[in-house]
Design a protein with these regions (language model features):
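Histidine-acidic metal/acid-base catalytic patches
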Residues: 1-101
Length: 101
């Protein structure tokens, strides 16, 4: 899986995504955003469009590498999104998926 939260800062990301694509090894694509500043390295992911990650650029590289599967939204957010009403979160996820992914 290519999880933008774990790889967005890697200067060699484009090369490695292309390499993985040539080998047919991209099996999943996960999106969230990196909150600045972050409060927890694992459980403070931001909603797409609210952080530092250029998700559309990375998505373009992943698709250029041949991936055309599902995109999984992973908002692990104990301080924010997990505390909100589920319908509100789903509405925002859908809107942000259209505008920030």
């Amino acid at each position: 899986a290519i999880d933008v939260y774990h790889v967005w800062f890697d200067p060699g990301l484009d090369v490695q995504v292309a390499r993985a694509g040539m080998a047919g090894r991209i099996l999943a694509f996960h999106v969230s955003d990196w909150r600045v500043p972050t409060r927890d390295l694992l459980l403070d992911r931001a909603m797409m469009g609210d952080g530092a990650i250029d998700i559309p650029r990375i998505r373009g590289r992943v698709e250029d590498a041949g991936y055309d599967g599902l995109i999984e939204v992973e908002i692990f957010s104990q301080h924010d999104w997990w505390r909100r009403d589920a319908e509100e979160v789903l509405t925002i996820v859908a809107e942000r998926f259209r505008t920030a992914v």
